[in-house]
Amino acid sequence: GGLELTDEIRLTIAAQACLLLLHRKTDYYPQLASILVYPSSYTAHEKRHLGANIWEEGDEHRLGHTGRRLGSLVLAWDDARRGAANPSDGRNLVLHEFAHQLDFEDYATDGAPALATKAEYQSWARVMSREFAALRSAAETGIPTVLDIYGAENPAEFFAVVTEAFFERPRALRAKHPELYAEFARFFRQDPIQYSAEPGRRTLNKR
């Protein structure tokens, strides 16, 4: 009763994963060894450290997961397919999980991927910390935001959520969070506004 991996599944996942690597001088997700695809959401046993000697343990439903230690990535196919079918809703499971892979490239799950210079790290930290705090505040007060409030969980989830918005809702992200958009455009070395399916007027570079 397992899921047969068809060309549609392989190509849908690969095409979206490759989008994050365009124009970047990088290896092809060097930490990733395997991708497991479920037909739909699945249940996993989770144990979380809450601080001090406090742990939380139980089962949770998941759509996807990235495991650095095992070099693995898990996706629910029905959600991955929905994300590909609607490229402008700001939610994309494949982009989200592969963004975690980029975050892991420097062996730290902190929302700061490997950057080229000290100045880039400083600029990244300044903008990301401010924007992360703003999203947490929005999540607590119920203020509408371009970003999925799941990104308020921690810096790693914030990076993955902003990646989704950067590629799927670039116009809205740049309008509401221009410095954040600029940091991601610098990191990914592309401007998704040039090809986005997001509704709105296209802006072409004039040179």
Question: Residue ranges of each PLM-predicted region?
Answer:
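Short alpha-helix carrying the canonical HExxH Zn2+-binding catalytic motif
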Residues: N86-D103
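Extended, charge-biased low-complexity segments
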Residues: A33-I35
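Metalloprotease/metallohydrolase-associated module, dominated by Zn2+-dependent proteases
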Residues: R10, A14-H23, S40-S88, E105-R207
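Active-site loop/lid in soluble adenylation, ligation, and acyl-transfer enzymes
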Residues: G1-Q16, P30
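Conserved, charge-rich beta-strand/loop surface module that forms ligand/interface-binding patches
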Residues: K25-Y29
